[in-house]
Every structure is written in structure tokens, then in C-alpha cells.
């Protein structure tokens, strides 16, 4: 909001400078965006009277004038402005004057005629961009007076950012209230006395939507002269607030809007059929607006209508048919309170944002309408003449906002502010803010003023007290708190530690939306039901994710489309699985997922560009599982997954419980998702891994280790992992390492069978093992494999 400093000082005039006033307004919570002079720097410009005005003998577009500036003689000045005429009061730059831009006025001859000064336009004095003609001052302007003094051009404009909760400050009165409260000064309101009706003319008003319009005031004013000139003082106030003067009727309603924050509208009375009806539009109903555009209305749009058609979009924009024009003689003034919810969003729907909608959406003082209509009536009659009828007031009191009654506790006030403010001062601040205050022991009960509908809870009062008391007056007190050393379980593995390990292995962390495209998710999890949002951000973000892979694979595609061929990404976060046994029917699991694509290594002169495979990601995952201390309890089992390659994927089990999966993305899915090349993914339930096995210290053997290799032939479908586990189990006391180092099938091995070459490392912590003991342990392993898997030693 932009306003004139002098206009504000008409309401409240603290004895402080403009800069201090701007700082004070900012500290009161209304951030000042800028303070600017209303006119350029100039001197030597005075009020003059055009005594004579005649045609220049040598130029068609110039006039020769004689100007009275209160001196000993009349000044001869040549002027080219089309509006220059005899009897006009003008702004005269006399010889020696300096105008903005360091332009000095000198005596000169123009086409043979002497000119002893210049008649100035607004643009030449850097007051506005209006350069169509010279300034026309009021007829009663005193001759010879400095124009800067006469027009109060030592004024400044102050522009503030008004937060949504302070709609009461979208008018001079609201800002003035805050300045008055801070400076403990009275508020000086202009004359807003009731205008006594001089005629009995009224217009019937009916409100069919009282919830949307709890109060509607209308007043007939007849016999006005729309062609009357808006007084210069009003035009200047409007200009300094960034409003262009249009005609006196519109200027008056804009003036009241800026002064009181109450939007108003004037209808051409003679164009209203029957009476005014405040109602909701019918779906598809059309209204031609003041700017000539046609608006197709929805059923939730509030309109002001007569008995035949809509006249205006309530609180937003007037209609062309009932708008005031040069032929208007009789008007209906409207001053209403519209429920903010009935206005919010309607203007944007039609690509509009007006001063009225801006205020109504945030809220207008429901007790302001009578004051506004009386103020507008007085100004309109003073400028345009006419006679006013009585005010017609249609109010549904039960639908008007109720003033909140709030209890403020001393304990809460001191705790939130961190400083004790004397009770007398607290009471005084609340009363100066307009609250009705009742002191209840050490506490207060306050009724918020009608214009402060943002005061609703106790914290609002605490904020107001601190704001007016002054944040700078609250002493800085160092925060004192006991440092509590929390216990850390050795078994707890930090997710951050795992993330760091992945980053160390060349991965980058991704953070994707929990809202995903249901179509893409259905490709990954065709058998699982997803949670669909009733109010999604967009159609492709309308489902809650069942796994992290939907977002990660989308991130891979996004990066591949931007020339990133080698990718290593991981993410941790929640998945949302419908589950009737869970709270609210949704099970939320913390998941950890990763994806790799492209080449195994970055481009290097000494390394071949090898594509990644299943085992690259499996190795990285095993490194993470090693941190948990549970790698020995983890099994990778061949199981089908709809999103993964059937021959290059595995389910992950921990102590027999399924916790995730790993594998190459199915080729068909790669095609549908536009993935470029082989992509390998994993996902595990982090909460199953967060408690790690605490490492147990054991003695390092000082005795030599012995390695024995065996090759056993087993059926193709026997997992090598089961073979290794059986060897560990049988040789538990002496076998300290078991490793698979070769797999062979083909010549020399029967069809349907495979040969597994296994190394056994044997060692004892107390002595050196004898050859007979080693052979016996190896024999036990072979026998166990024979009994369980029908294995045989390969020749």
C-alpha cells in the first residue's frame, strides 16, 4: 500500500522526522518498502494569474500572456499549452527559477516575443508524467505564493508491505491507529458526521445470500453533476497513492477506499430496474464488466443484480451497464461487508485483481460501512452537488463476524516474551489497540476491536503487546539450558553413517516427491493397491509411493535426458502401503533404495568403458550390510519380481524375513520408462537393519591358517549360498573362511548339474592343526554336502 505522509499526519502527527516515522512503522510490523519525494527539486515557482492571453503573431501554436505573480508589474510569458486561457491560476517559473534537472529559467525571445518565465506542467516539476497541459490551480489560489508550499510538495510517499493478517492497514486509518498507539497520541478523524437526508428517495434492497453478504448499505443521491472537477487536493492525494483521477464519483469512492479501507461502488440509479438483489449467480450467467470484457459467472460467484440482470461482481468489479458516465445524474452508493470466503479466488478465476477484491479477500471491518457511506456522501455532495436520501441498511447480524474474547495469562505473556512488562502498561497497550479490557487478577480478558479480526488466540495478544512495547525495549537475555547427554545404544546404526558410506562409494543422494504418477507406479507394482489422493497437486502426482523406485527411476530418466550417462543415486524415505491393520489404514516403512546406470567407471585413459552389471550394485549393497554386522545373516534368493529381469534379480532375506530386493530393471520396463541402457536397483527396509549386531572381540590366532580346495557337483537348482552355509555349519570350530571361486558346467559335468569350486580356510586359536585334523574336517564337510544336497566330489 502506498500513501502520502502528510495525509497520514492529518490523522496523527508525531513530532518525528520522515525517516524516523518510516522506521517506526516498520518496527510496528508494517514493513516500509520505500519512501519517495512527491515532486522534484525546484525553486522560484509561484502561483500566477493569467490576466491576458492572446495569439502569438508569428506562431499558430503559441500564445502570448500577461501574468500577475504579485509583483510590481505583469510578466510577459509565451506559452504553448492548449489549455492556457485568461483567468486561469497557474504555476509560474519566474526568471532565475531552477527546475528539476538543473533547468534554469532565463528571459528570452520566442519568435520575436519576449518571455519572462514559463508556465509549468506537472511533468516539468517532476510531480507526475502528465504533460498534456499546464497546471490549473484552484481559483482561490493566492497569487505569488510558492507553489511548493501551496501544493504541499515537501510531502513524501510511503509504500508498505501489508501482511495478510493486517488487512486493517489497507487504509490510512489503520496505519494511523498503529502510529497513534506507538506514540501514545490521539487519533484525529476527519468529519464523518451523518448526512441528513434531504429527499425521501430509496431503492429496495434484498439480500438472498446473507452468509456471503451479512451487511449491505445503499443510498440514493440525486441531481449530481458528474462533469464537476475533482478538487486539486483530492486529485493530489489520490495521485500520491498511485491512483489516477477519473471523475468525481469514482474519485470519491477511491478516496474513501484509501482513507478507511472500505471498498465502495456507485451505480447509475437510472439504469437499475426495480431494485437491488444481492445473490449468487446462476451457472453460466454473463456480465459485461466496466472494461468491456465479458465474464462467464459460476454458481458460487456473488453478484449485485437488479430484477433483470447482474450489475456487478460483488466486491470485485462493476458492470458496464450500470456504470457511472458523463450522462449520469442520479447514483446509488454501495457500502457492504462481504464474507472473505465468498470473494476469495473469484477475481483470479477471471484474471482480475482489484483494490476492492484485495481488501475483501483479506477482510474488511464489519462496523465500517455506515461511516464510509456517510463520508462518501458528504464528499460527493460537496463536489458534485445533489441531494441524498436515507441510508437503506440490510444487515443479518447473526452472520456478521463475532469479536473474539481472549484471555491473556500473565505466565504465558512473560514466558513467550521472556521479559516482565508491568501490568498497568499491558492494560494500557491493549486499550490503546482498541480492545475492551477486563483485568482478572494477574490476567486479562480482552475483546478484540471489530477491525482486528486477526486477533483470535492468546498468542495474538502476546504478539501485540510485544509489538507495541517495542522489540528493541526487550533486553537480550542469554538462553540458559541444561545440556542433557542422551544415551546412545551401541547397537543403533545411524542412517547418516550409511549415507556417508554410499557417498564415499560415488553415489549422490536424491530427494524425490512422495507423490508419484500412478501409471508409472502401476508398471513397477502391478499387483499392489496404492493410496490415491483426493486433491493432488497434479494428475501425475496423485498417488502415494509404494516404494522409492518410482521417484529414483524418474530421476535417472531426467538426468539421462540431460547428457548424464553414468549415474549412482540413492534415497531414503517413507513408503505408504495400504494396510487395514495399521493406524488410519496406512503402513509407513522407512526404506533405503539405490540405482546405478551407465558405465562401471568414469571415463579414464587406462580403463576400458565397461557397462555396469548386477554384481556392481550387489557389492555396494553388501558393503552397507557389512556396516550392520548382519551380512552373514543375509541371503539373496532367486525370486521373481514384476519390475526386474527374471534371471538377474534376487529377493533379500534377513534371518528368514523378506526385507527387500535387488536386480536389473526388466527390459520391457526399461522401454516403457525410456531408460537408456541397463539399470540396476535395490530397495531394503531400513528399520529392519537399523539395529546392528554389536561386534564381539575375539582373539586373533597366532597359528598358521590352512587352505583346502574342493570341487563338488550338485544339481543346477541348488544355491551356492546353501553349500557355503553348510560348510560353515559343519566346520564351525575350525573353518574360519569359506569362499566360492569357480562355477562350471559343461563337458565332464552331467547335464542339469554344475561344479562348484570352494576354498576352505581352517585355523585354530590354541594350536597348529595337524594334517589328519584338517583332512577329517574337510571330509565331514563333503559328507554333509553329500547327505543334504546329494553332492559328489568332482574327479
UniProtKB/Swiss-Prot annotation:
Mg(2+) binds at residues 454, 460, 463-464. GO terms for molecular function: ATP binding; magnesium ion binding; phenylalanine-tRNA ligase activity; tRNA binding. The keyword Protein biosynthesis applies. Coiled coil: none annotated. It is found in: Cytoplasm. Residues 701-794 form the FDX-ACB domain. It is an enzyme of class 6 (ligase). One of its GO terms (cellular component) is phenylalanine-tRNA ligase complex. Its cofactor is Mg(2+). It holds the Pfam family FDX-ACB. Binds 2 magnesium ions per tetramer. One of its GO terms (biological process) is phenylalanyl-tRNA aminoacylation. Its main location: cytoplasm. It comes from the Bacteria. Belongs to the phenylalanyl-tRNA synthetase beta subunit family. Type 1 subfamily. This is Phenylalanine--tRNA ligase beta subunit.
Amino acid at each position: 500500500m502506498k500513501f502520502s505522509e502528510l495525509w497520514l499526519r492529518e490523522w496523527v502527527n508525531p513530532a518525528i522526522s520522515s525517516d524516523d516515522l518510516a522506521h517506526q512503522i516498520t518496527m510496528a510490523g508494517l514493513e516500509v518498502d520505500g519512501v519517495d519525494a512527491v515532486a522534484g527539486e525546484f525553486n522560484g515557482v509561484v502561483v500566477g494569474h493569467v490576466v491576458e492571453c492572446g495569439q502569438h503573431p508569428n506562431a499558430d501554436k503559441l500564445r502570448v500572456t500577461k501574468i500577475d505573480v504579485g509583483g510590481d508589474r505583469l510578466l510577459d510569458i509565451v506559452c504553448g499549452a492548449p489549455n492556457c486561457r485568461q483567468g486561469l491560476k497557474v504555476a509560474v517559473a519566474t526568471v532565475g527559477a531552477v527546475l528539476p534537472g538543473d533547468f534554469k529559467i532565463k528571459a528570452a525571445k520566442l519568435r520575436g516575443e519576449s518571455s519572462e518565465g514559463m508556465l509549468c506542467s506537472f511533468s516539468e516539476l517532476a510531480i507526475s508524467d502528465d504533460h498534456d497541459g499546464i497546471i490549473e490551480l484552484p481559483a482561490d489560489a493566492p497569487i505569488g505564493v510558492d507553489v511548493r508550499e501551496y501544493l504541499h510538495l515537501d510531502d513524501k510517499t510511503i509504500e508498505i508491505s501489508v501482511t495478510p493478517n493486517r488487512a486493517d492497514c489497507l487504509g490510512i486509518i489503520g496505519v494511523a491507529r498503529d502510529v497513534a498507539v506507538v506514540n501514545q497520541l490521539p487519533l484525529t478523524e476527519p468529519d464523518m458526521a451523518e448526512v441528513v437526508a434531504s429527499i425521501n428517495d430509496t431503492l429496495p434492497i434484498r439480500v438472498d445470500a446473507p452468509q456471503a453478504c451479512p451487511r449491505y448499505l445503499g443510498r440514493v443521491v440525486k441531481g449530481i453533476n458528474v462533469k464537476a472537477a475533482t478538487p486539486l487536493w483530492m486529485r493530489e492525494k489520490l495521485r500520491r497513492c498511485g491512483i489516477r483521477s477519473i471523475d468525481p464519483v469514482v474519485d470519491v469512492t477511491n478516496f474513501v477506499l484509501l482513507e478507511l479501507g472500505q471498498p465502495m461502488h456507485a451505480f447509475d440509479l437510472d439504469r437499475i430496474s426495480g431494485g437491488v438483489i444481492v445473490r449468487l449467480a446462476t451457472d453460466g450467467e454473463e456480465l459485461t464488466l466496466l472494461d468491456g470484457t465479458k465474464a462467464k459467472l459460476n454458481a458460487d460467484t456473488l453478484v449485485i443484480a437488479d430484477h433483470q440482470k447482474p450489475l456487478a461482481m460483488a466486491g470485485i468489479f462493476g458492470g458496464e451497464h450500470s456504470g457511472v458516465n458523463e450522462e449520469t445524474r442520479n447514483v446509488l452508493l454501495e457500502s457492504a461487508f462481504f464474507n472473505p470466503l465468498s470473494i476469495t479466488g473469484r477475481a483470479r478465476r477471471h484474471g482480475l485483481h482489484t483494490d476492492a477484491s484485495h481488501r475483501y479477500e483479506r477482510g474488511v471491518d464489519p462496523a465500517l460501512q455506515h461511516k464510509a457511506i456517510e463520508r462518501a456522501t458528504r464528499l460527493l455532495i460537496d463536489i458534485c452537488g445533489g441531494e441524498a436520501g436515507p441510508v437503506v441498511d440490510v444487515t443479518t447480524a447473526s452472520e456478521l463476524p463475532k469479536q473474539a474474547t481472549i484471555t491473556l495469562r500473565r505466565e504465558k505473556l512473560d514466558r513467550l516474551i521472556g521479559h516482565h512488562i508491568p501490568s498497568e502498561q499491558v492494560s494500557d497497550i491493549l486499550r490503546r489497540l482498541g480492545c475492551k479490557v477486563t483485568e482478572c487478577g494477574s490476567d486479562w480478558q480482552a475483546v478484540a476491536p471489530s477491525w482486528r479480526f486477526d486477533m483470535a488466540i492468546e498468542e495474538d495478544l502476546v504478539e501485540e503487546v510485544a509489538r507495541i512495547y517495542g522489540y528493541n525495549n526487550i533486553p537480550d537475555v542469554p538462553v540458559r539450558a541444561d545440556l542433557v547427554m542422551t544415551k546412545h545404544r551401541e547397537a543403533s546404526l545411524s542412517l547418516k553413517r550409511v549415507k556417508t558410506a554410499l557417498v564415499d562409494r560415488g553415489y549422490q543422494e536424491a530427494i524425490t516427491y512422495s507423490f508419484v504418477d500412478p501409471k508409472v507406479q502401476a508398471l513397477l507394482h502391478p499387483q499392489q493397491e496404492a493410496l490415491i489422493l483426493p486433491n493432488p497437486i497434479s494428475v501425475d502426482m496423485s498417488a502415494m509411493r509404494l516404494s522409492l523406485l518410482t521417484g529414483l527411476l524418474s530421476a535417472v530418466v531426467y538426468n539421462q535426458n540431460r547428457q548424464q550417462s553414468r549415474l549412482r543415486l540413492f534415497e531414503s524415505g517413507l513408503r505408504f502401503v495400504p494396510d487395514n491393520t495399521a493406524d488410519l489404514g496406512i503402513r509407513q516403512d522407512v526404506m533405503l533404495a539405490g540405482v546405478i546406470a551407465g558405465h562401471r567407471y568414469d571415463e579414464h585413459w587406462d580403463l576400458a568403458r565397461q557397462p555396469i552389471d548386477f554384481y556392481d550394485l550387489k557389492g555396494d549393497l553388501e558393503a552397507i550390510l557389512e556396516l550392520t554386522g548382519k551380512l552373514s545373516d543375509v541371503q539373496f534368493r532367486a525370486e521373481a519380481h514384476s519390475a526386474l529381469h527374471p534371471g538377474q534379480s534376487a529377493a533379500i532375506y534377513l534371518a528368514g524375513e523378506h526385507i527387500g530386493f535387488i536386480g536389473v530393471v526388466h527390459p520391457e520396463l526399461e522401454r516403457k520408462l525410456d531408460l537408456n541402457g541397463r539399470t540396476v536397483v535395490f530397495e531394503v527396509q531400513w528399520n529392519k537393519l537399523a539395529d546392528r549386531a554389536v561386534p564381539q572381540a575375539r582373539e586373533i590366532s597366532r597359528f598358521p591358517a590352512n587352505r583346502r580346495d574342493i570341487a563338488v557337483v550338485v544339481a543346477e537348482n541348488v544355491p551356492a549360498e546353501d553349500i557355503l552355509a553348510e560348510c560353515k555349519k559343519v566346520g564351525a570350530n575350525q573353518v574360519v573362511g569359506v569362499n566360492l571361486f569357480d562355477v562350471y558346467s559343461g563337458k565332464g559335468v552331467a547335464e542339469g548339474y554344475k561344479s562348484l569350486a570352494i576354498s576352505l580356510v581352517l585355523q585354530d586359536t590354541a594350536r597348529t592343526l595337524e594334517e589328519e585334523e584338517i583332512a577329517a574336517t574337510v571330509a565331514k564337510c563333503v559328507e554333509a554336502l553329500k547327505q543334504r544336497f546329494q553332492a559328489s566330489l568332482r574327479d
